[in-house]
């Protein structure tokens, strides 16, 4: 990117549609469940039959209020539904029921760590609305599945408070973590239960103006989100640089784009509609939604400890690395696994590394995550304790971890009982002989160590561990090696 490009910055906001995991739809008793046969979870309400009337789902309201409390938003005592009119085959009523002017939650914030820096991203509002159906294409024809029509959504709208792709991805990750902790959505991006639309404009660095924004629809991975934002930033900057004397509104018009991952570029879908094009008006078949302060307080009391609070506690109380703490708290199941393991092991740093690095990598290779493998937290704690007590070496511990992930049903103790060959070397006489032999064969390294080159000691230890196949106790190896070199 040239110097001219570095003189510009992105201004980014996100609109996130989250399907709520209620039993039934937002305004009808039809089942809310993904993956069923097409058009089996429908009712007169969600298919727009004449005379059908919507009835608001109480559980959807509670989940929206719970989210508002989680992000410290202002939950409205009075909110209202509106009709957003548009024609499309997946909208059988030709309108969506949403909250245009009076949302259920205003404000709030999402806290995230971006490249080691803690940032707070402000929310504009969160509102309830129902989802559309799905168009499915089959060669030369298309079908409509209304199973999703009427599924309850919250749309979470941020302020334009992000200034890089890294900001946007960190915000999105933090948001998904919060939703997972409070349990209001499964956030399955592949199934579309959470969908990210990103809005981006650019401006000269130091400027406060907000130029026309471009919306990039339906980001279904964080990798694509980052790529799309970077590509669109470049496109807009190049447009402005190509037409420096033109009206900025004409150079980059407000529009909706999609991301093409193969071409690595954003592709125009349509120019932006205006609000009046949707002909918003008050939903006549629903009363004003009224809730009480008492109800909001009752919902707030059910909040669990949230990811950011847990993250701060981990790095202060457990003194673990910030990057590992972030991985641990990103998923509530992993955090629970770690905290259960800490009841049996007090080497928190080693424990966090084994959970987030060693076991996570092994489990990922098998398409699983550690909390859902059958491996108990106590077993990982036992493995770390065995290393700390010198029962096994780090190399043997990795072999045991391999076997734990392969079997998903054995503790380190069970594995050592069945495979005594994994136990460390206990023959001190044989170990002394190996140390003596290594020292005799590497006199240059011994001399280097005596001349102050600390790395030479590591080399000698490595040679001994190689000959013992990693089974020699490291502490004993160091003791014998230092003694042997002193005697030379």
UniProtKB/Swiss-Prot annotation:
Matches recorded under Gene3D superfamilies: 1.10.10.410, GatB domain, N-terminal subdomain
Function in brief: Allows the formation of correctly charged Asn-tRNA(Asn) or Gln-tRNA(Gln) through the transamidation of misacylated Asp-tRNA(Asn) or Glu-tRNA(Gln) in organisms which lack either or both of asparaginyl-tRNA or glutaminyl-tRNA synthetases. The reaction takes place in the presence of glutamine and ATP through an activated phospho-Asp-tRNA(Asn) or phospho-Glu-tRNA(Gln).
Domain of life: Bacteria
Subunit-structure text: Heterotrimer of A, B and C subunits.
GO biological process assignments: glutaminyl-tRNAGln biosynthesis via transamidation; translation
Single GO term (MF): glutaminyl-tRNA synthase (glutamine-hydrolyzing) activity
Protein name: Aspartyl/glutamyl-tRNA(Asn/Gln) amidotransferase subunit B
Recorded catalytic activity of this chain's protein: L-glutamyl-tRNA(Gln) + L-glutamine + ATP + H2O = L-glutaminyl-tRNA(Gln) + L-glutamate + ADP + phosphate + H(+); L-aspartyl-tRNA(Asn) + L-glutamine + ATP + H2O = L-asparaginyl-tRNA(Asn) + L-glutamate + ADP + phosphate + 2 H(+)
Family classification: Belongs to the GatB/GatE family. GatB subfamily.
This enzyme's EC code(s): 6.3.5.-
Keywords noted in UniProt: ATP-binding, Ligase, Nucleotide-binding, Protein biosynthesis
A family per Pfam: GatB_Yqey
Signal sequence extent: none
Record InterPro entries: Asn/Gln-tRNA_amidoTrfase_suB/E (IPR017959), Asn/Gln-tRNA_Trfase_suB/E_cat (IPR006075), Asn/Gln_amidotransferase (IPR018027), Asn/Gln_tRNA_amidoTrase-B-like (IPR003789), GatB (IPR004413), GatB_C_1 (IPR042114), GatB_Yqey_C_2 (IPR023168), Gln-tRNA_amidoTrfase_suB_CS (IPR017958)
Class of this enzyme: ligase
